[in-house]
């Protein structure tokens, strides 16, 4: 991925900068343009331009699609701006449970070696509620389903974690 991104960097940057959407509109054309621009961003994040491009994309976003695209790429590419952007997003959206579900899901898919510890710590976050199925799914479900390297770690720690969560869940809300 890094080699492809570096090889295509100039073309990706040209397309990315050419697509300018001033106002947010829900039209097929604008949706397609946002998708193309965010696809370019997803590759540019893995180049030496990644940190600056992703941070500017986040700061200039005027809609949740672009905001989450930048946050997603900062997280997946483990960019230096990641923690600052995650903290900013949390501060802005901490009182909106559905939006925070996105934040929890992103945290659970981090490529960090210590992601399991991060997920466990987030279970004590003020916006996390173990008895809220959406919150549990966004954090624990994202970890188990979308962070396969960490979940299937050779130590078995991901399996033990999920087992503990399921036992606790069965005691409090067996229908989930």
PLM regions and their residue ranges:
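Long, ordered, helix-rich scaffold segments
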Residues: 1-176
């Amino acid at each position: 991925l890094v080699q492809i991104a570096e090889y295509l960097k100039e073309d990706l940057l040209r397309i990315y900068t050419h697509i300018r959407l001033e106002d947010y509109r829900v039209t097929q054309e604008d949706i397609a343009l946002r998708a193309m621009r965010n696809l370019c961003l997803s590759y540019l994040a893995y180049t030496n331009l990644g940190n600056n491009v992703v941070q500017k994309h986040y700061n200039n976003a005027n809609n949740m699609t672009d905001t989450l695209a930048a946050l997603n790429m900062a997280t997946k590419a483990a960019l230096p701006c990641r923690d600052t952007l995650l903290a900013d997003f949390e501060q802005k959206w901490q009182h909106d449970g559905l939006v925070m579900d996105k934040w929890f899901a992103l945290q659970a898919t981090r490529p960090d070696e210590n992601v399991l510890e991060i997920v466990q710590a987030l279970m004590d976050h003020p916006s996390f509620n173990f008895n809220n199925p959406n919150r549990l799914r966004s954090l624990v479900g994202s970890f188990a389903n979308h962070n396969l390297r960490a979940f299937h770690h050779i130590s078995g720690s991901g399996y033990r974690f999920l087992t503990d969560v399921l036992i606790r869940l069965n005691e409090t809300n067996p229908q989930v």
